[in-house]
Protein backbone atom coordinates (compact mmCIF):
# COMPACT_ATOMS: atom_id res chain seq x y z
CA UNK A 1 0.00 0.00 0.00
CA UNK A 2 2.87 2.36 -0.62
CA UNK A 3 2.48 5.36 -2.88
CA UNK A 4 4.73 5.42 -5.87
CA UNK A 5 5.30 8.51 -7.92
CA UNK A 6 4.69 8.05 -11.62
CA UNK A 7 6.22 10.64 -13.87
CA UNK A 8 4.18 11.66 -16.87
CA UNK A 9 5.51 13.89 -19.58
CA UNK A 10 3.22 14.55 -22.49
CA UNK A 11 2.36 17.26 -24.93
CA UNK A 12 -0.82 18.10 -26.77
CA UNK A 13 -1.79 20.62 -29.37
CA UNK A 14 -4.20 23.40 -28.49
CA UNK A 15 -6.26 24.93 -31.27
CA UNK A 16 -8.03 28.14 -30.32
CA UNK A 17 -9.96 27.98 -33.57
CA UNK A 18 -11.44 24.59 -32.65
CA UNK A 19 -12.14 25.79 -29.10
CA UNK A 20 -13.96 28.86 -30.39
CA UNK A 21 -16.16 26.71 -32.64
CA UNK A 22 -17.03 24.35 -29.77
CA UNK A 23 -17.78 27.28 -27.43
CA UNK A 24 -20.01 28.91 -30.04
CA UNK A 25 -22.21 25.87 -30.58
CA UNK A 26 -22.30 24.87 -26.91
CA UNK A 27 -23.37 28.32 -25.73
CA UNK A 28 -25.93 28.53 -28.56
CA UNK A 29 -27.41 25.19 -27.41
CA UNK A 30 -27.60 26.41 -23.82
CA UNK A 31 -29.68 29.39 -24.91
CA UNK A 32 -31.78 27.15 -27.16
CA UNK A 33 -32.70 24.94 -24.19
CA UNK A 34 -33.18 27.63 -21.54
CA UNK A 35 -34.35 30.93 -23.06
CA UNK A 36 -37.51 32.00 -21.22
CA UNK A 37 -39.61 32.52 -24.36
CA UNK A 38 -40.16 29.33 -26.35
CA UNK A 39 -40.86 31.38 -29.48
CA UNK A 40 -37.58 33.29 -29.10
CA UNK A 41 -39.36 36.64 -29.46
CA UNK A 42 -40.43 35.61 -32.95
CA UNK A 43 -36.87 34.95 -34.14
CA UNK A 44 -35.58 31.84 -35.93
CA UNK A 45 -32.84 30.90 -33.47
CA UNK A 46 -31.42 28.11 -35.64
CA UNK A 47 -31.26 30.42 -38.64
CA UNK A 48 -29.27 32.95 -36.61
CA UNK A 49 -26.90 30.18 -35.47
CA UNK A 50 -26.14 29.21 -39.05
CA UNK A 51 -25.86 32.81 -40.22
CA UNK A 52 -23.25 33.84 -37.66
CA UNK A 53 -21.40 30.52 -37.88
CA UNK A 54 -20.23 31.58 -41.34
CA UNK A 55 -17.71 33.86 -39.60
CA UNK A 56 -16.21 31.20 -37.33
CA UNK A 57 -13.34 30.19 -39.68
CA UNK A 58 -12.14 33.79 -39.74
CA UNK A 59 -12.10 34.42 -35.98
CA UNK A 60 -8.59 34.97 -34.62
CA UNK A 61 -9.25 36.29 -31.11
CA UNK A 62 -11.64 36.00 -28.19
CA UNK A 63 -12.75 39.58 -28.73
CA UNK A 64 -14.01 38.59 -32.19
CA UNK A 65 -15.79 35.54 -30.73
CA UNK A 66 -17.45 37.73 -28.11
CA UNK A 67 -18.49 40.16 -30.83
CA UNK A 68 -20.23 37.68 -33.14
CA UNK A 69 -21.87 35.71 -30.31
CA UNK A 70 -23.22 38.80 -28.58
CA UNK A 71 -24.39 40.13 -31.95
CA UNK A 72 -26.28 36.86 -32.43
CA UNK A 73 -27.82 37.19 -28.96
CA UNK A 74 -28.85 40.73 -29.85
CA UNK A 75 -31.13 39.34 -32.56
CA UNK A 76 -33.41 38.13 -29.74
CA UNK A 77 -34.07 41.71 -28.63
CA UNK A 78 -33.90 40.65 -25.00
CA UNK A 79 -32.29 41.74 -21.76
CA UNK A 80 -30.15 39.97 -19.18
CA UNK A 81 -27.95 38.18 -21.68
CA UNK A 82 -24.28 38.17 -22.54
CA UNK A 83 -21.33 35.98 -23.44
CA UNK A 84 -17.85 36.53 -22.03
CA UNK A 85 -14.62 34.69 -22.63
CA UNK A 86 -11.15 35.61 -21.40
CA UNK A 87 -7.87 33.82 -21.92
CA UNK A 88 -4.26 34.30 -20.90
CA UNK A 89 -3.51 35.71 -24.32
CA UNK A 90 -5.59 38.76 -23.30
CA UNK A 91 -4.04 39.27 -19.87
CA UNK A 92 -2.57 42.67 -20.74
CA UNK A 93 -3.64 45.73 -18.78
CA UNK A 94 -3.94 48.97 -20.70
CA UNK A 95 -6.26 50.78 -18.32
CA UNK A 96 -5.81 53.70 -15.99
CA UNK A 97 -6.88 54.53 -12.44
CA UNK A 98 -8.71 57.69 -11.50
CA UNK A 99 -7.05 59.90 -8.90
CA UNK A 100 -10.20 61.69 -7.80
CA UNK A 101 -10.12 64.58 -5.33
CA UNK A 102 -13.81 65.44 -5.08
CA UNK A 103 -13.32 68.88 -6.62
CA UNK A 104 -16.09 70.02 -8.96
CA UNK A 105 -14.88 72.19 -11.82
CA UNK A 106 -16.81 74.85 -13.71
CA UNK A 107 -18.36 73.79 -17.03
CA UNK A 108 -17.32 76.99 -18.79
CA UNK A 109 -13.92 77.28 -17.09
CA UNK A 110 -12.78 73.65 -16.78
CA UNK A 111 -9.81 74.39 -14.51
CA UNK A 112 -11.73 76.62 -12.08
CA UNK A 113 -13.20 75.20 -8.85
CA UNK A 114 -16.99 75.44 -8.68
CA UNK A 115 -17.70 73.23 -5.66
CA UNK A 116 -16.62 70.45 -3.32
CA UNK A 117 -18.24 67.03 -2.91
CA UNK A 118 -19.13 66.36 0.73
CA UNK A 119 -16.87 63.91 2.61
CA UNK A 120 -14.49 63.68 -0.36
CA UNK A 121 -10.69 64.17 -0.05
CA UNK A 122 -11.13 67.88 -0.83
CA UNK A 123 -13.73 68.29 1.94
CA UNK A 124 -11.25 67.48 4.72
CA UNK A 125 -10.55 70.19 7.27
CA UNK A 126 -7.45 72.21 6.40
CA UNK A 127 -7.73 71.99 2.61
CA UNK A 128 -9.63 75.30 2.49
CA UNK A 129 -10.49 75.22 -1.19
CA UNK A 130 -12.90 77.87 -2.41
CA UNK A 131 -15.12 78.47 -5.39
CA UNK A 132 -13.11 80.37 -8.01
CA UNK A 133 -9.71 78.84 -7.19
CA UNK A 134 -7.84 78.05 -10.42
CA UNK A 135 -5.89 74.83 -11.00
CA UNK A 136 -2.33 75.62 -12.13
CA UNK A 137 -0.45 72.30 -11.86
CA UNK A 138 -0.86 68.64 -10.88
CA UNK A 139 2.13 66.86 -9.35
CA UNK A 140 4.32 69.70 -10.61
CA UNK A 141 3.11 69.48 -14.21
CA UNK A 142 1.50 72.70 -15.41
CA UNK A 143 -1.95 72.15 -16.84
CA UNK A 144 -2.69 73.02 -20.46
CA UNK A 145 -6.09 74.62 -20.96
CA UNK A 146 -6.33 73.02 -24.40
CA UNK A 147 -6.06 69.46 -23.09
CA UNK A 148 -8.54 67.14 -21.39
CA UNK A 149 -8.44 67.90 -17.68
CA UNK A 150 -8.91 64.22 -16.76
CA UNK A 151 -5.47 63.47 -18.23
CA UNK A 152 -3.96 65.00 -15.09
CA UNK A 153 -6.12 62.90 -12.75
CA UNK A 154 -5.45 59.48 -14.31
CA UNK A 155 -2.49 57.13 -13.94
CA UNK A 156 -1.56 53.53 -14.87
CA UNK A 157 -1.50 52.65 -11.15
CA UNK A 158 -3.28 54.09 -8.14
CA UNK A 159 -1.24 56.65 -6.19
CA UNK A 160 -1.54 57.36 -2.48
CA UNK A 161 -0.98 61.08 -2.93
CA UNK A 162 -1.59 63.80 -5.47
CA UNK A 163 -0.28 67.37 -5.24
CA UNK A 164 -2.24 70.29 -6.69
CA UNK A 165 -1.07 73.85 -7.25
CA UNK A 166 -3.88 76.40 -7.32
CA UNK A 167 -4.15 80.17 -7.67
CA UNK A 168 -6.36 82.51 -5.67
CA UNK A 169 -6.32 86.28 -6.23
CA UNK A 170 -2.94 86.08 -7.95
CA UNK A 171 -1.30 83.97 -5.24
CA UNK A 172 -0.33 80.34 -5.81
CA UNK A 173 -0.63 77.70 -3.08
CA UNK A 174 -0.17 73.93 -2.85
CA UNK A 175 -2.57 71.30 -1.50
CA UNK A 176 -1.85 67.56 -1.13
CA UNK A 177 -4.58 64.92 -1.20
CA UNK A 178 -4.99 61.22 -0.65
CA UNK A 179 -7.05 60.60 -3.81
CA UNK A 180 -10.17 58.45 -4.00
CA UNK A 181 -11.33 56.08 -6.72
CA UNK A 182 -13.93 57.16 -9.26
CA UNK A 183 -16.32 54.59 -7.75
CA UNK A 184 -15.96 56.15 -4.30
CA UNK A 185 -16.67 59.61 -5.71
CA UNK A 186 -19.76 58.31 -7.53
CA UNK A 187 -21.08 56.97 -4.22
CA UNK A 188 -20.49 60.34 -2.54
CA UNK A 189 -22.30 62.15 -5.37
CA UNK A 190 -25.19 59.70 -4.97
CA UNK A 191 -25.29 60.36 -1.21
CA UNK A 192 -25.47 64.11 -1.87
CA UNK A 193 -28.31 63.62 -4.36
CA UNK A 194 -30.28 61.46 -1.93
CA UNK A 195 -29.73 63.92 0.95
CA UNK A 196 -30.89 66.80 -1.25
CA UNK A 197 -34.07 64.89 -2.12
CA UNK A 198 -34.67 64.05 1.54
CA UNK A 199 -34.24 67.70 2.57
CA UNK A 200 -36.48 68.81 -0.30
CA UNK A 201 -39.30 66.49 0.78
CA UNK A 202 -38.88 67.47 4.44
CA UNK A 203 -39.06 71.16 3.55
CA UNK A 204 -42.03 70.95 1.17
CA UNK A 205 -44.04 68.64 3.43
CA UNK A 206 -43.02 70.22 6.75
CA UNK A 207 -41.54 66.87 7.85
CA UNK A 208 -44.78 64.95 7.31
CA UNK A 209 -43.52 62.64 4.53
CA UNK A 210 -40.77 60.04 4.83
CA UNK A 211 -38.50 59.65 1.80
CA UNK A 212 -36.31 56.67 0.89
CA UNK A 213 -34.41 56.00 -2.32
CA UNK A 214 -33.20 52.51 -3.25
CA UNK A 215 -30.41 52.51 -5.86
CA UNK A 216 -30.69 48.76 -6.41
CA UNK A 217 -32.57 45.73 -5.07
CA UNK A 218 -29.76 43.92 -3.26
CA UNK A 219 -29.49 42.69 0.32
CA UNK A 220 -27.46 45.67 1.49
CA UNK A 221 -29.91 48.16 0.05
CA UNK A 222 -32.84 46.21 1.54
CA UNK A 223 -31.23 46.43 4.97
CA UNK A 224 -30.72 50.18 4.57
CA UNK A 225 -34.33 50.57 3.38
CA UNK A 226 -35.65 48.84 6.52
CA UNK A 227 -33.30 50.68 8.87
CA UNK A 228 -34.33 54.04 7.39
CA UNK A 229 -38.04 53.32 7.71
CA UNK A 230 -37.93 52.00 11.27
CA UNK A 231 -35.84 54.92 12.52
CA UNK A 232 -37.75 57.33 14.71
CA UNK A 233 -37.12 60.14 12.20
CA UNK A 234 -39.10 58.37 9.47
CA UNK A 235 -41.41 55.89 11.23
CA UNK A 236 -43.40 58.63 12.95
CA UNK A 237 -44.15 60.52 9.73
CA UNK A 238 -47.58 60.46 8.12
CA UNK A 239 -46.72 59.11 4.66
CA UNK A 240 -43.95 57.67 2.50
CA UNK A 241 -42.33 58.29 -0.88
CA UNK A 242 -40.35 55.26 -2.05
CA UNK A 243 -38.08 56.33 -4.90
CA UNK A 244 -37.00 53.62 -7.36
CA UNK A 245 -35.79 55.96 -10.10
CA UNK A 246 -32.43 54.87 -11.58
CA UNK A 247 -32.72 51.58 -9.67
CA UNK A 248 -30.58 48.89 -11.34
CA UNK A 249 -32.35 45.83 -9.94
CA UNK A 250 -31.49 42.75 -7.88
CA UNK A 251 -33.88 40.32 -6.20
CA UNK A 252 -35.50 41.63 -3.01
CA UNK A 253 -38.88 42.71 -4.39
CA UNK A 254 -40.80 40.28 -2.19
CA UNK A 255 -39.19 41.57 1.02
CA UNK A 256 -39.86 45.20 0.08
CA UNK A 257 -43.51 44.55 -0.79
CA UNK A 258 -44.05 42.48 2.34
CA UNK A 259 -42.66 45.30 4.49
CA UNK A 260 -44.82 47.93 2.78
CA UNK A 261 -47.92 45.72 3.10
CA UNK A 262 -47.82 45.59 6.91
CA UNK A 263 -50.97 46.96 8.54
CA UNK A 264 -51.76 47.88 12.10
CA UNK A 265 -53.90 45.15 13.66
CA UNK A 266 -53.64 45.79 17.45
CA UNK A 267 -52.47 48.24 20.07
CA UNK A 268 -50.51 47.25 23.15
CA UNK A 269 -48.97 49.02 26.12
CA UNK A 270 -47.20 48.50 29.40
CA UNK A 271 -49.19 49.44 32.53
CA UNK A 272 -49.75 53.20 32.60
CA UNK A 273 -47.71 53.49 29.42
CA UNK A 274 -48.66 54.78 26.00
CA UNK A 275 -50.46 52.68 23.46
CA UNK A 276 -48.16 51.41 20.72
CA UNK A 277 -49.15 49.86 17.42
CA UNK A 278 -48.74 46.28 16.30
CA UNK A 279 -47.16 45.78 13.89
CA UNK A 280 -44.70 48.47 14.86
CA UNK A 281 -44.35 49.75 11.32
CA UNK A 282 -47.69 49.67 9.51
CA UNK A 283 -46.81 51.62 6.39
CA UNK A 284 -49.82 50.24 4.55
CA UNK A 285 -51.99 52.35 6.87
CA UNK A 286 -50.39 55.48 5.41
CA UNK A 287 -50.40 57.09 1.96
CA UNK A 288 -47.51 55.73 -0.13
CA UNK A 289 -46.25 56.97 -3.48
CA UNK A 290 -43.81 54.99 -5.61
CA UNK A 291 -41.56 56.98 -7.96
CA UNK A 292 -40.27 55.29 -11.14
CA UNK A 293 -38.72 56.50 -14.38
CA UNK A 294 -37.31 55.24 -17.66
CA UNK A 295 -34.21 54.00 -15.83
CA UNK A 296 -36.06 51.89 -13.25
CA UNK A 297 -35.22 48.40 -14.42
CA UNK A 298 -35.17 44.69 -13.62
CA UNK A 299 -36.26 43.99 -10.03
CA UNK A 300 -37.38 47.60 -9.66
CA UNK A 301 -39.99 46.74 -12.29
CA UNK A 302 -41.03 43.62 -10.37
CA UNK A 303 -41.44 45.79 -7.28
CA UNK A 304 -43.47 48.40 -9.18
CA UNK A 305 -45.72 45.74 -10.74
CA UNK A 306 -46.34 44.15 -7.34
CA UNK A 307 -46.95 47.55 -5.74
CA UNK A 308 -49.62 48.29 -8.35
CA UNK A 309 -51.27 44.85 -8.11
CA UNK A 310 -51.44 45.03 -4.30
CA UNK A 311 -52.94 48.52 -4.42
CA UNK A 312 -50.36 49.94 -2.01
CA UNK A 313 -50.54 53.44 -3.45
CA UNK A 314 -50.03 55.63 -6.50
CA UNK A 315 -47.13 55.20 -8.94
CA UNK A 316 -45.79 58.49 -10.33
CA UNK A 317 -43.19 59.15 -13.03
CA UNK A 318 -42.64 57.59 -16.45
CA UNK A 319 -42.83 54.06 -17.87
CA UNK A 320 -40.13 51.73 -16.59
CA UNK A 321 -37.23 50.44 -18.72
CA UNK A 322 -38.75 47.08 -19.87
CA UNK A 323 -35.70 45.05 -18.82
CA UNK A 324 -36.75 42.21 -16.52
CA UNK A 325 -36.01 38.49 -16.83
CA UNK A 326 -34.66 36.46 -13.95
CA UNK A 327 -31.40 34.93 -14.96
CA UNK A 328 -28.93 32.14 -14.31
CA UNK A 329 -25.81 31.29 -16.28
CA UNK A 330 -23.48 28.53 -17.38
CA UNK A 331 -19.74 28.22 -17.62
CA UNK A 332 -17.75 26.43 -20.29
CA UNK A 333 -14.74 24.23 -19.66
CA UNK A 334 -12.27 27.02 -20.47
CA UNK A 335 -13.88 29.42 -18.00
CA UNK A 336 -16.08 31.27 -20.47
CA UNK A 337 -19.52 32.22 -19.18
CA UNK A 338 -22.87 33.07 -20.70
CA UNK A 339 -26.02 34.36 -19.03
CA UNK A 340 -29.33 32.53 -19.36
CA UNK A 341 -32.46 34.72 -19.21
CA UNK A 342 -34.75 31.89 -18.15
CA UNK A 343 -37.65 33.14 -15.98
CA UNK A 344 -40.09 35.55 -17.57
CA UNK A 345 -42.09 37.91 -15.35
CA UNK A 346 -45.79 38.46 -16.04
CA UNK A 347 -48.61 40.42 -14.46
CA UNK A 348 -51.64 38.47 -13.25
CA UNK A 349 -53.48 39.42 -16.44
CA UNK A 350 -50.64 38.03 -18.57
CA UNK A 351 -48.60 41.08 -19.60
CA UNK A 352 -44.90 40.40 -20.11
CA UNK A 353 -42.92 42.95 -18.09
CA UNK A 354 -39.94 42.47 -20.43
CA UNK A 355 -41.93 43.99 -23.27
CA UNK A 356 -44.57 46.03 -21.42
CA UNK A 357 -42.81 47.42 -18.36
CA UNK A 358 -44.87 49.22 -15.71
CA UNK A 359 -46.85 52.37 -16.50
CA UNK A 360 -47.37 55.01 -13.80
CA UNK A 361 -50.79 55.98 -12.50
CA UNK A 362 -49.80 59.62 -12.96
CA UNK A 363 -47.38 60.39 -15.79
CA UNK A 364 -44.83 63.08 -14.95
CA UNK A 365 -41.71 63.48 -17.08
CA UNK A 366 -38.47 65.10 -16.05
CA UNK A 367 -36.40 66.85 -18.72
CA UNK A 368 -32.69 67.41 -19.01
CA UNK A 369 -33.37 71.10 -18.37
CA UNK A 370 -35.15 70.18 -15.12
CA UNK A 371 -32.05 68.32 -13.97
CA UNK A 372 -29.75 71.21 -14.88
CA UNK A 373 -31.90 73.79 -13.11
CA UNK A 374 -32.78 71.67 -10.07
CA UNK A 375 -36.50 71.42 -10.82
CA UNK A 376 -38.18 68.38 -9.25
CA UNK A 377 -41.50 67.84 -11.11
CA UNK A 378 -41.78 64.16 -10.13
CA UNK A 379 -41.07 64.76 -6.44
CA UNK A 380 -43.36 67.80 -6.52
CA UNK A 381 -46.24 65.71 -7.86
CA UNK A 382 -45.61 62.95 -5.29
CA UNK A 383 -45.67 65.49 -2.46
CA UNK A 384 -48.80 67.14 -3.86
CA UNK A 385 -50.69 63.83 -4.17
CA UNK A 386 -49.79 62.76 -0.62
CA UNK A 387 -50.60 66.12 1.00
CA UNK A 388 -53.96 66.20 -0.79
CA UNK A 389 -54.74 62.78 0.67
CA UNK A 390 -53.53 63.72 4.15
CA UNK A 391 -55.58 66.91 4.14
CA UNK A 392 -58.87 65.24 3.16
Model-derived features: where do they sit?
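PDZ/PDZ-like groove recognition
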Residues: 32-51, 102-117, 208-211
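Extended, small/polar residue-biased N-terminal targeting/export presequences
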Residues: 56-108, 171-197, 383-384, 390-392
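In a subset of proteins, long, contiguous C-terminal domains/tails are tracked
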Residues: 79, 123, 137, 234-237, ...
Amino acid sequence: NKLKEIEIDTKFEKSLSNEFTQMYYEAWAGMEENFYNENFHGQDWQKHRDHYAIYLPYITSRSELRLIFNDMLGELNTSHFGFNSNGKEEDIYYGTHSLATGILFDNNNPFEVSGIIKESPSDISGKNLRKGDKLIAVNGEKVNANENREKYFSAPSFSNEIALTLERNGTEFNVNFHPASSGNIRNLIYDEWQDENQNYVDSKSKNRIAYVHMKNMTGGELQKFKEDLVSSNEADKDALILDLRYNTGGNVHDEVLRFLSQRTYLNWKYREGKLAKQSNFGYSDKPIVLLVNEQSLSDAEMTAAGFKELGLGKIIGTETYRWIIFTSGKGLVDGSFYRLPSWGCYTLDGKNLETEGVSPDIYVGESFKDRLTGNQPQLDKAIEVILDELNK
